[in-house]
Amino acid sequence: MKCLIILVIFAIATTQIRAACNQQSDCPPGSCCKKPNSYMEGGCFPLLKRGESCYVKDNRIYDVYREKCPCGEGLRCHQFAEGIWQGQCVETS
């Protein structure tokens, strides 16, 4: 129970630090509007960096990303294997 309370407090604190958003244009360059989960409001988060885990397919619903931002400028999401939606941000070649 203590762990759950700590997680809820952390989620609320993290949400309040981020700028709220409802669409991509609400966020500054180098960031995206995403909802970390179904229960949280949208917030501006940094685009993914080289080596970070990403989604190969577009994961936007109504111009808000779900769970992960896309890879940053000059990067693309390289698919791990066919049939898997996740990949890793790598330099565009």
Curated annotation (Swiss-Prot):
UniProt keyword list: Disulfide bond, Secreted, Signal
Tissue: Expressed by the venom gland.
Signal peptide: 1-19
Disulfide bridges in this chain: C21-C33, C27-C44, C32-C69, C54-C77, C71-C89
GO cellular component: extracellular region
Compartmental location: Secreted
Pfam families: Prokineticin
Main subcellular localisation: secreted
Family: Belongs to the AVIT (prokineticin) family.
Protein name according to UniProt: Venom protein 164
Source taxonomy: Eukaryota, Metazoa, Ecdysozoa, Arthropoda, Chelicerata
